[in-house]
Amino acid sequence: MTDFDPNQVSFAQGAVRIEGVIRKHKLDLNKIMTSRDQHVRAALKDLGVSNVPKGFGKVQLPFVFPQSQFFISHAEANGKVGEHAHHGGDALRFIAAGSVTYNGVELTEGDWMYVPKGVSYSLGIGARGATMCYCYCCCCAGFADVRDWIVDPGPEIARH
């Protein structure tokens, strides 16, 4: 066994740290943030993690999700995602490959984008396409995707 112990701090203690950093840096969780934003980069300096195995670096991100579902998506080159919002909850998008453009800023491999519940946005897809991992506090699947799995789908799902 190594000296690395990932169980030193509880989820709640980690959330308290994040709340403190949000206050210190006056981050607005009602606005979209990306890893390219200067004010976010400053906050991340206070969220570095030293409890990692040798040869690793780690930073905690400046938000907490109480529950979430994960998705991976692939987008064709030069595509567009029209203006939309996620009304069920906050979302986090990691760019795994390729690139997307949000509000004139290109996000590339390793970048991320936090999207608060209900905030509208659109994206452009880069020349190499994009592979993204999403963490949603909502589902984002369609009615047809869940219909066969729901015991009592209710009228909203049943009519689709």
Where are these regions (language model features)?
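Conserved short histidine dyad/triad with adjacent acidic residue
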Residues: V52-H86, E106-E109, K117-S120, P153
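Glycine- and acidic-residue-biased ligand/ion/polar-headgroup-sensing regions
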Residues: A77, H87-T101
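Short beta-strand His + acidic residue motifs that chelate non-heme Fe in jelly-roll/DSBH
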Residues: V81-H84, Y102-G104, Y114-V115, Y121-Y134
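Hydrophobic residues on conserved beta-strands that form the core of alpha/beta folds
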Residues: F70-I72, I95, M132
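Short His-Asn-centered micro-motif
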Residues: A96, P116-K117
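Double-stranded beta-helix
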Residues: M1-A15, S122, G126-H160
